[in-house]
């Protein structure tokens, strides 16, 4: 299947906030409660439709550990969108957002669209960060904001697609030079290998972790 545009995404945030689970829910529509800890960077892809145009999302899921931050930073370059994820049940993951955002702003292109995601919103009884706090952080830093649950799929589609809509709007407004692929946008040529292909998260050598929801 051909596509009009390809958008590159990066998913960032602390270890265990559910980055890999969000990707798996979006690409495969399934939840994996026990998930391999991401080592380095993993990859997924899916086709979506915006305004009647086929858009291919190419999504890089990064490791949250500090030891992999240098690898993660190299993927900021050439990303049109970023999903910055925290866990609403773990206050420290919210407190670390400023550091992640600083990294993104320092290493990414200045027009990258950033979606702030408060994940695991199904665990309301364990909530440690209010929705209002997430909204306020997003407002202060010019981010889009949603709360999601990779377990129930709540708002997962919306998180990825709304980010793409914002990128598409920037293209329409002339913000991006789409001939420059360093912006994380590639114009499609109707090639034969444009269909949704996913390298499923968890494949490859990794250590087991059950902290993903």
UniProtKB/Swiss-Prot annotation:
Keywords: Cell membrane, GTP-binding, Lipoprotein, Membrane, Nucleotide-binding, Prenylation, Protein transport, Transport. It is found in: Cell membrane. Its main location: membrane. It is a lipid-anchor. InterPro entries: P-loop_NTPase (IPR027417), Rab_GTPases_membrane_traffic (IPR050209), Small_GTP-bd (IPR005225), Small_GTPase (IPR001806). GO terms for cellular component: plasma membrane. A motif (Effector region) lies at residues 35-43. GTP binds at residues 13-21, 61-65, 119-122, 149-151. GO terms for molecular function: GTP binding; GTPase activity. One of its GO terms (biological process) is protein transport. Protein transport. Probably involved in vesicular traffic. Belongs to the small GTPase superfamily. Rab family. This is GTP-binding protein YPTC4. The lineage of its organism: Eukaryota, Viridiplantae, Chlorophyta, core chlorophytes, Chlorophyceae.
């Amino acid at each position: 299947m051909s596509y009009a545009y390809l958008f590159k995404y990066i998913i960032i945030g602390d270890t265990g906030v559910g980055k890999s689970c969000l990707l798996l829910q979006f690409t495969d529509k399934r939840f994996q409660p026990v998930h391999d800890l991401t080592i380095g960077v993993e990859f997924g892809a899916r086709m979506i439709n915006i305004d009647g145009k086929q858009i291919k999302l190419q999504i890089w899921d990064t490791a949250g550990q500090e030891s992999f931050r240098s690898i993660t930073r190299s993927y900021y370059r050439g990303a049109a969108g970023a999903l910055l994820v925290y866990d609403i049940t773990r206050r420290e993951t919210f407190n670390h957002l400023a550091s992640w955002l600083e990294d993104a702003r320092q290493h990414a292109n200045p027009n990258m669209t950033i979606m702030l995601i408060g994940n695991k919103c199904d665990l309301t009884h364990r909530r440690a960060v209010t929705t209002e706090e997430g909204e306020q952080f997003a407002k202060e830093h010019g981010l889009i904001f949603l709360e999601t649950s990779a377990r129930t799929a709540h708002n997962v589609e919306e998180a990825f697609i709304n980010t793409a809509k914002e990128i598409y709007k920037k293209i329409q407004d002339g913000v991006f030079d789409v001939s420059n692929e360093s912006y994380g946008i590639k114009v499609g040529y109707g090639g034969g290998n444009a269909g949704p292909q996913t390298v499923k998260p968890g494949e490859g050598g990794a250590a087991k972790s059950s902290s993903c929801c």
